[in-house]
Swiss-Prot record:
GO terms for cellular component: cytoplasm; ribonucleoprotein complex; ribosome. The gene is rplU. This protein binds to 23S rRNA in the presence of protein L20. Pfam families: Ribosomal_L21p. GO terms for biological process: translation. GO terms for molecular function: rRNA binding; structural constituent of ribosome. It comes from the Bacteria. It comes from Listeria monocytogenes serovar 1/2a (strain ATCC BAA-679 / EGD-e). This is Large ribosomal subunit protein bL21.
Length: 102
């Protein structure tokens, strides 16, 4: 059985036991997170939400809170002596999917 959930402005296909990386969620390591924005549940009998499946939830456990590798953002304007260098590290949350309840 699998499901498609919405979190952090993205849609992610998940299965039980899968490890996923999502945009940062509030919670400490070991906390249980419940997603109620389930768009689709697949398996023996597929359920499509309009826009979400009624009563369907996905539970996951927080494994890690971290930050991605640094990206360098560099801006410049030619002939104007304007240079700007900036770094960015996007925070993320690593989850392990426990169960899909439909």
């Amino acid at each position: 059985m699998y499901a498609i959930i919405e979190t952090g402005g993205k849609q992610i296909k998940v299965e039980a036991g899968q490890e996923i990386y999502v945009e940062k969620l509030a919670g400490e390591v070991g906390d249980v997170v419940t997603f109620d924005k389930v768009l689709f549940v697949g398996g023996d009998s597929a359920k499509v939400g309009v826009p979400f499946v009624e009563g369907a939830t996905v539970t996951a456990k927080v494994e890690k809170q971290g930050r991605a590798k640094k990206l360098t953002v560099y801006k410049y304007k030619p002939k104007k002596n304007y240079h700007k260098k900036q770094g960015h590290r996007q925070p993320y949350t690593k989850l392990t999917i426990d169960a899909i309840n439909a």
